[in-house]
Amino acid sequence: MKLVTTSRNWSKMAPEYIPGRCNIGRRGRAIRLTTGVVLIGLSIIFEIFALKPSNHLVRLGLAFPFYIGILACLEGSMSFCVLHSSRATYDLHEPRGFASKKSDTLEKVGSEDWKKLDRRKALRMHLEALSGAVLLALLLALT
């Protein structure tokens, strides 16, 4: 007797483009999330061990790698690439795992309303990443 019934296997279902919400697939999400976590971790380790005795203003320069890392983590967790948004494209089956113009599965966003939703989401993500990076850099610079 089966206790679990399988109605649909959601992991094998093809992803779908949703304006302002999803423009990358599973591989792109995984690579972006991993890249972001590694970049943030390496930046924190570098700050703790290499920049500890140096000037606090120099340590604030780590806001840039923090920004890139946080933005990559946001892209991975939200299934949304800001570069695809700026190009008005989406790619749910990225063969390389990053936004590339040479991808065979790259699609153009058709509607102007959809482009506007994508740009609004990208701007929000940039602001979240920037505020997180500045906050993290300030916290580490003041310690």
Features from the language model and the residues they span:
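Membrane-interfacial helix-loop segments of redox and metal-homeostasis proteins
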Residues: 2-143
